[in-house]
């Protein structure tokens, strides 16, 4: 087993991916890690939708770009895989549960030698009719909202670590 702190410190948000698809078994390991995240009150009302097809991912990115006025160049950074975390609509813990699952997902991708980028635009556009139609076609349940998604793949261009801020911790004894 790897050193967890090393994995945490080496994780980056990558915005330049190679077009090569990672092995499907690695993607399923990533999803399994997400499934093991904690969930408020043990509800586990999330759903993971894997878009293991660069063309379909690009089609969704184009719909998001149109809905969010991002321009024609928006493409989920060219990642060949996109994993969507959705949650039952109107559930109190959806955002924090989804965030916990996403962190597990991102760390497992790093552990497996893949890179990732957390993407929020689907949360903001999931109910735009053109976007919702694709989400439904790809397997996101109708009664779910998108919490977040992750672009997954191999790195095209190295991403240096950003400096961390100081003074963000208070300890009371």
Q: What function would you assign to each model-found segment?
A:
Residues 1-173:
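Acidic, surface-exposed loops and disordered segments
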């Amino acid at each position: 087993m790897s050193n967890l702190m090393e994995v945490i410190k080496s994780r980056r948000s990558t915005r330049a991916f190679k077009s090569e698809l990672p092995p499907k078994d690695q993607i399923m390991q990533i999803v399994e890690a997400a499934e093991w995240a904690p969930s408020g009150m043990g509800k586990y009302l999330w759903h993971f939708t894997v878009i293991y097809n660069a063309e379909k991912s690009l089609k969704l990115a184009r719909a998001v770009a149109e809905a969010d006025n991002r321009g024609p160049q928006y493409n989920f950074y060219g990642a060949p895989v996109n994993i969507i975390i959705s949650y039952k609509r109107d559930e109190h813990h959806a955002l924090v549960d989804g965030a916990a699952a996403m962190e597990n997902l991102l760390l497992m991708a790093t552990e497996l030698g893949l890179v990732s980028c957390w993407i929020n635009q689907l949360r903001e556009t999931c109910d735009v009719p053109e976007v919702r139609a694709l989400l439904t076609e790809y397997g996101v349940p109708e009664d779910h909202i998108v919490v977040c998604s992750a672009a997954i793949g191999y790195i095209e261009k190295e991403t240096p670590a950003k400096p961390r801020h100081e003074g963000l911790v208070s300890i009371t004894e």
